């Protein structure tokens, strides 16, 4: 007998299906389900009187033949699509995306459920890949809790704690500090990778940091980012298949942006805060967005451009770069970096896919828990101010959503050589997954999985009779305890360090994963974010011209995903 359900009734029971639309939080962004992998009438759902019971939706297969965990009827939002599916997890990895159930009695089943299978109800939830923040100043370990609670599951950067050097630069300098930080990484339920200090004009001081475990090198103007240092650093990176991140020369002491681009010599490099407020050739570092070898990112304080953006930046910059407001030269240095015109253009360059990534700059002119929020606030602002993208239609913002989710998932993974493990929801990848209620999308995840195990979740009073009574807040779960921690998170290192046996030498508990293919990636590989405009910045007015068009927009006076969701 066939029972017909209204779309509303179906969505309330099994989640939205093909053609249904979902609003992302309180934004103007709507996504539409492009495909439903489940079979109508054969959906699986757990609970009293529901489908996943012995002999019904649960088969008799043994553990080897079934997933460890199934997320049922979830909406997947990833760079490759927006679909409804069941997600299978096995041995800490995504095993399949498809239709779960009992193949002995149900048609179209691609994922068998058994007695060894745990169930996470994904009905009505959105699942994204764990976020990747590639601009971390490791100033305080407490950042990790904030990042994880926001949906970030991988942190890449440098530092040694609240040292003056780390407060300003994302570098873990030298083999001794690298070893200590890699040992510290064993204590945190998040994937970590560290950048060494790249500012040297001879190879050996850099090579020894790569050999000690650095996944790449960071060039920072506060250490002297001269053309000679850039050239040497990129040569070492080419020899070791590691990435280089750069904060260029704001003062133009060692040369102008053209000098820096010339020092690149066509070699791949990740440019941090490419707009320039976070640092870089004033006023025209944005020009590098047009280079095929440059992988450009933003940091989140300028995202998106609002009526408050300029006011907060000056004081923030003075503190982060150890400047003295009573010294005229220090004040001029700070003021040269804060330009409303380039910040406004940054919004549009993100929307058009010229800026490929977004990161935090944690505690050093950036907020570690707001990468995802500010990404989607930027997308919303651009939808309101610029309308639908040409690739989208009047019904949905699917392409825009794919473009923006790629900025903090797959593109950072490709840039830093870790896309073979993380960065997207695809079979074979590490099961770092974030579950969201649509009303709280991008703001407050319901649950964060690390390596297939629940690491953090919104949880009520532990003494209550059920999980939901107040106070509900983020609490660490079992993936963060004991030996499970080391088996559900990864530490990224260089291939050179892995081959040298640092895991045994340092006594590391976490699995180490070498980065790879860092030197082959180009701007063309930045998914949905590969536009290479010819950019000029007027040295007097700071107006930004891209392919002959002036890029400007008004500051936002109000934003979604803000005070509606937070008390403070």
Swiss-Prot record:
EC top class named in words: hydrolase
UniProt xrefs under PROSITE patterns: UREASE_1, UREASE_2, UREASE_3
Binding site for Ni(2+) 2: 218, 247, 273
UniProt PTM comment: Carboxylation allows a single lysine to coordinate two nickel ions.
GO molecular function, one term: urease activity
Active-site residues, Swiss-Prot/TrEMBL: 321 (proton donor)
Keywords from the named record: Cytoplasm, Hydrolase, Metal-binding, Nickel
Pathway where this protein functions: Nitrogen metabolism; urea degradation; CO(2) and NH(3) from urea (urease route): step 1/1
Cellular location(s): Cytoplasm
Gene3D superfamilies tied to this protein: Metal-dependent hydrolases (3.20.20.140), Urease, subunit C, domain 1 (2.30.40.10)
Positions bound to Ni(2+) 1: 135, 137, 218, 361
Main location: cytoplasm
Cofactor names: Ni cation
Positions where N6-carboxylysine occurs in the chain: 218
Assembly notes: Heterotrimer of UreA (gamma), UreB (beta) and UreC (alpha) subunits. Three heterotrimers associate to form the active enzyme.
Name of the molecule in the record: Urease subunit alpha
Organism: Burkholderia lata (strain ATCC 17760 / DSM 23089 / LMG 22485 / NCIMB 9086 / R18194 / 383)
């Amino acid at each position: 007998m066939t029972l017909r359900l209204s779309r509303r009734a179906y969505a309330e029971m099994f989640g939205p299906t093909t053609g249904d639309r979902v609003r992302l939080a309180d934004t103007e962004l709507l996504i539409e389900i492009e495909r439903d992998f489940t079979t109508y009438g054969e959906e699986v759902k757990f609970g009293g009187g529901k489908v996943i019971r012995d002999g019904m939706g649960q088969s008799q297969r043994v553990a080897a033949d079934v997933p460890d965990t199934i997320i049922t009827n979830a909406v997947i939002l990833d760079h490759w699509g927006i679909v409804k599916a069941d997600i299978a997890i096995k041995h800490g990895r995504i095993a399949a995306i498809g239709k779960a159930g009992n193949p002995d009695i149900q048609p179209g089943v691609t994922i068998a459920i058994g007695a060894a299978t745990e169930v996470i109800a994904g009905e009505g939830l959105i699942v994204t890949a764990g976020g990747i923040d590639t601009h971390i100043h490791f100033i305080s370990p407490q950042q990790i809790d904030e990042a994880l609670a926001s949906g970030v599951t991988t942190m890449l950067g440098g530092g040694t704690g609240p040292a003056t050097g780390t407060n300003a630069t994302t570098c873990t300098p030298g083999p001794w500090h690298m070893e200590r930080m890699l040992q510290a990484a064993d204590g945190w339920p998040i994937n970590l990778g560290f950048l060494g200090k790249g500012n040297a004009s001879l190879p050996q001081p850099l090579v020894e940091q790569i050999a000690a475990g650095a996944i790449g090198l960071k060039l920072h103007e506060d250490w002297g980012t001269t053309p000679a240092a850039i050239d040497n650093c990129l040569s070492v990176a080419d020899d070791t298949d590691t990435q280089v991140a750069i904060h260029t020369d704001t003062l133009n002491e060692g040369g102008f942006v053209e000098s820096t681009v010339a020092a690149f010599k066509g070699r791949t490099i990740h440019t941090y805060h490419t707009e320039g407020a976070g640092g870089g050739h004033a006023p025209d570092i944005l020009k590098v967005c047009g280079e095929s070898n440059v992988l450009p990112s933003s940091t989140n304080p300028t995202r998106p451009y609002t009526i408050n953006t300029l006011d907060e930046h000056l004081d923030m910059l003075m503190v982060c770069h150890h400047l003295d407001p009573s010294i005229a030269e220090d004040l001029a240095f700070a003021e040269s970096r804060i330009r409303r015109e380039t910040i406004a253009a940054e919004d549009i360059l993100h929307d058009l896919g010229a800026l490929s990534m977004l990161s935090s700059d944690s505690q050093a002119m950036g907020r570690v828990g707001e990468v995802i929020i500010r990404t989607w606030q930027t997308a919303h602002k651009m939808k309101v101010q610029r309308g639908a993208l040409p690739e989208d239609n009047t019904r949905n913002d699917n392409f825009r959503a794919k473009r923006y989710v790629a900025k903090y998932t797959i593109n950072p993974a490709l840039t830093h050589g870790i896309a073979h493990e993380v960065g997207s929801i695809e079979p074979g990848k590490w099961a770092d997954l974030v579950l969201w209620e649509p009303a709280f999308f991008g703001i407050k995840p319901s649950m964060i999985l690390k390596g297939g195990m629940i690491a953090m979740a919104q949880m009520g009073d532990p003494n209550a009779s059920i999980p939901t009574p107040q106070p509900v807040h983020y609490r660490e779960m079992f993936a963060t305890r004991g030996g499970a921690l080391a088996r559900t998170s990864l530490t990224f290192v260089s291939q050179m360090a892995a081959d040298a046996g640092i895991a045994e030498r340092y006594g590391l508990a976490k699995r180490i994963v070498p980065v790879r293919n860092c030197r082959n990636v180009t701007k063309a590989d930045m998914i949905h974010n590969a536009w290479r405009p010819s950019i000029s910045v007027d040295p007097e007015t700071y107006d930004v011209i891209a392919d002959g068009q002036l890029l400007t927009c008004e500051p936002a006076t109000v934003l979604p995903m803000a005070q509606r969701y937070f008390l403070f």
